[in-house]
A protein has these predicted regions:
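Extracellular glycan-modifying ectodomains
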Residues: 1-197
């Protein structure tokens, strides 16, 4: 999730320099290595992220992941820690995803002409997690990615090109399209220029 968020933001805002500190299945949350990732390397990677990388001069730290209910409290603790270091934080909220990989859903369809319509019953909406996150961490903006992805509908193709390469990750075109929508929905330059926490 974080890697294609990086791709999305880089394409939407070419005037800014973005860096990423991502690893597959390693949620960027502080001191909760038991849920921060399923691999043993996540623990050392998270220690590096939150002891070394956070000390670099950055205008903003963007946290993006597959957010679940059990990650809200450690995310809150992570935000408090980052604020204590004087860091500005933005959270990319839970995304809509699909019950099956999008290419598989398309292969089951009858034609590309109506695939966006035919997959709508395969959408998994995580807006309830977004509401819980916003309630727990009101001091930080949490972007409603589900609304951005599904404005006005949860399309999986644009013309004849895929927007997702699996259940939840954007293709390059998907990152570009969702980045365009992100830019319209959220004023990142203004957010970055607001006073630090």
């Amino acid at each position: 999730m974080a890697a294609d968020t990086y791709m999305m933001l880089s394409q939407a805002y070419p005037e800014y320099t973005f860096s990423q500190a991502t690893a597959d299945a390693c949620t960027g949350i502080l001191d909760r290595f038991d849920i921060g990732g399923r691999y043993s390397t996540c623990r050392s990677f998270n220690q590096y992220r939150f002891s070394e990388l956070v000390r670099l001069d950055m205008d903003l730290i963007v946290l993006a992941s597959i957010w679940e209910e059990d990650r809200i409290q450690p995310l809150k603790e992570t935000v408090a820690y980052l604020h204590s270091l004087g860091k500005k934080v933005l959270i990319i909220g839970p995304r809509v995803h699909f019950r099956d990989a999008v290419p598989l859903l398309i292969s089951r369809g009858t034609s590309l002409d109506n695939v966006n319509f035919s997959v709508r019953n395969r959408v998994v909406d995580r807006s309830f997690v977004l509401r819980q996150m916003r309630q727990a961490i009101p001091e930080v903006d949490i972007v409603d990615m589900g609304s951005i992805q599904c404005a006005p509908s949860c399309d999986v193709i644009d013309g004849d090109r895929l927007l997702y390469y699996d259940k939840r990750h954007f293709t390059q075109l998907g990152a570009q399209r969702f980045g365009e929508r992100f830019k319209k929905a959220f004023d990142l330059p203004t957010y970055m220029s607001e006073p630090d926490p």
